[in-house]
Every structure is written in C-alpha cells, then in structure tokens.
C-alpha cells in the first residue's frame, strides 16, 4: 500500500492537463473495446468528466468531485454496471496503456498503477461464470487505509 503522502504528490506532478490527457486516452480505448463499450453509457461525456474530477481529487487535486457529486462511494456507484473479473482486467489494461501513452512520469505512474490495480477489484460485481449468481463484494478485501483515503 502506498503512503498517503505519495498518493497526494501525484496531482502536483501530473497536473490538470495530465489527468485530462489520461482520461481521454483511456476513453479512446474504452470506445473501441467490444467488452467494455457496452458497459458504458452511449454518451461518454459525463463519465469522462466524472473520472477526470475523481482522479484529480483522489491524487491530491481540488475536491471538485466531492463538491459536485458527494462521497465517491465507487463500489456503490458502479453497482448498476455488470463488471466481471475479465472486464476489470481489461479496464486495468486500458488504464495502464493510457498512463504509458500520456507519459505520466515516475514515481507518479507507479502510484497510479498500484491504486488502479488494487481498487479496481472492488468494482467487480458479477461472476465471469454465466451460471454463477451475481455477487456483491464487500469492502473487507480493500485495505481500510484506502477506504479512509477515498472517503475523505
């Protein structure tokens, strides 16, 4: 788990333009992905903006996401969307590729990759097995320190 101080140093090192470029690069991949595209709304404009505001805030930027939308509560906000382990893995692959494409510098890229790798697991809300029932993951597998940071 990354120390909070390292997480909060990402925004000053990446800046608004870096986060905007990251989200744009990520969403270009989502738009072209046959597994992920159907999970997202037809109009990606609002999702892009929310992701930009959330990432900027989480990594030490202005708290505009919380001011506009309240507590992120990401697992709850993603519950309506069918997210399997496979979809999560593809999502992470696209986010990592976007980090590389944009050229997020170290150590910020590593901090971001660790966050995406760990926290994306909490978004899984469906089994990859077609015959398995939908399950609701608990926050138990998410480190309490990360939950506290996200809820701030």
Regions found by a protein language model. Give the residues of each.
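Core of compact, soluble alpha-helical bundle domains
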Residues: 1-152
